[in-house]
Amino acid sequence: MSFVFQAEVRSDLGKGASRRLRHADQVPAIIYGAGKEAQSITVDHKKFIIAQEKPEFYESVLTLVINGEEVNVKVKAIQRHPVKPKLVHLDFVRV
């Protein structure tokens, strides 16, 4: 099964900007690895909540479409809210 998600580059960084994204049903994330510079992005919360329920989500190579460019990544870390069923932050590593 292949997973393809839309993502947007984010320019506003920091605690306040991340909170605003979470209130807008977006999840702040970062992509790093493969000898390239780290890139801060945002992804849709609802799509990731649904996808992460499947076991193959954690094993598969995911495709993130960022500004029309496809980037193959794997999930490295997921930070979850301690009480609510929400994702707080995602870390991806380039493949």
UniProtKB/Swiss-Prot annotation:
Stated name of the protein: Large ribosomal subunit protein bL25
Species this protein is from: Aeromonas salmonicida (strain A449)
One Gene Ontology cellular component: cytosolic large ribosomal subunit
Subunit organization: Part of the 50S ribosomal subunit; part of the 5S rRNA/L5/L18/L25 subcomplex. Contacts the 5S rRNA. Binds to the 5S rRNA independently of L5 and L18.
Entry keywords, A to Z: Ribonucleoprotein, Ribosomal protein, RNA-binding, rRNA-binding
NCBIfam families recorded: bL25_bact_ctc, PRK05943.1
UniProt family annotation: Belongs to the bacterial ribosomal protein bL25 family.
Molecular function GO labels: 5S rRNA binding; structural constituent of ribosome
InterPro entries registered for this protein in UniProt: Rbsml_bL25/Gln-tRNA_synth_N, Ribosomal_bL25/Gln-tRNA_synth, Ribosomal_bL25_long, Ribosomal_bL25_short, Ribosomal_L25_dom, Ribosomal_uL5_bac-type
GO BP annotations listed: translation
